[in-house]
Structures are given as structure tokens and as C-alpha cells.
A protein has these predicted regions:
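Mature, well-folded catalytic/scaffold domains that follow N-terminal targeting or propeptide regions
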Residues: 1-127
Length: 127
């Protein structure tokens, strides 16, 4: 995270939302598929960035993509609910990132109760 630190959100008002969103996405790429290894520092950081993004849909988009990559194939129900909450907002930009990330988090989890209970509902939202 040291390399990306100047570009990552620091809380408060975003000076450059596109740089911050790109840095959050890059953080997810760097830590892709490591979410199940026990170290959840990056996922926690990305989740906090998502929650602190407020109505900034660009930062929400980058946070969602970062979460999806870092938590790939974990089937984490808390992350699923956070991403689903963004998906149901009236923002096409943020919802696109959330939808892609939901697929990444549920990767390989098709038989899990989380997927079985939620996929039919998610398909009703598909356009």
C-alpha cells in the first residue's frame, strides 16, 4: 500500500476521485485472490473506502472493483451485502462495479446457500 498511498482516499472530501478510484482498483489488482488467505487488511481498507465514499459514485466504483478482486472466490456474506447495497442504489456507474464484484466474490460458490438464496433476486435486477 506504500506505493499507492499518495493516491488512496484519506477520508473527507475527495480531491481527485478518479485517481482515488484507480488506486483502489489497483490495490485490488495487486492483492487479487488473496482474500481467503487470512489477512484481511486490504479488504478492510477497501470496505472502509466504500463506506466512506458517500455519494461519490466514481470512488464507489473503484472500491467495489478492488473488493471484488481482493476477495475473489471468498463467498464472504458481509462483503456480499455491502456490494448488494451499492447495486441497489440508483447509480449506473457504482452499480456496474458492484455487479462485477458480486460475481467475483461468488466465483466458484454457485452451490453455496449465499448464492442459492440471492442469485434469483439479483437476476430480477438485470437489465
Amino acid at each position: 500500500m506504500t506505493l499507492l498511498q499518495p493516491y488512496l482516499p484519506r477520508g473527507g472530501v475527495s480531491a481527485s476521485p478518479y485517481s482515488e478510484a484507480g488506486a483502489l482498483y489497483a490495490l485490488g489488482l495487486i492483492h487479487a485472490n488473496k482474500g481467503g488467505s487470512g489477512d484481511s487488511t486490504v479488504i478492510t481498507f477497501l470496505t472502509n473506502a466504500l463506506r466512506n465514499a458517500g455519494v461519490n459514485e466514481v470512488v464507489q466504483h473503484g472500491s467495489c472493483l478492488g473488493i471484488g478482486l481482493a476477495a475473489m472466490a471468498t463467498g464472504n456474506p458481509e462483503l456480499f451485502e455491502d456490494l448488494k447495497g451499492i447495486l441497489l442504489l440508483d447509480s449506473a456507474i457504482a452499480a456496474e462495479g458492484a455487479a462485477l464484484s458480486l460475481g467475483l466474490v461468488l466465483l466458484g460458490q454457485a452451490d453455496s446457500p449465499l448464492a442459492q438464496n440471492n442469485i434469483p433476486e439479483l437476476l430480477t435486477w438485470a437489465h
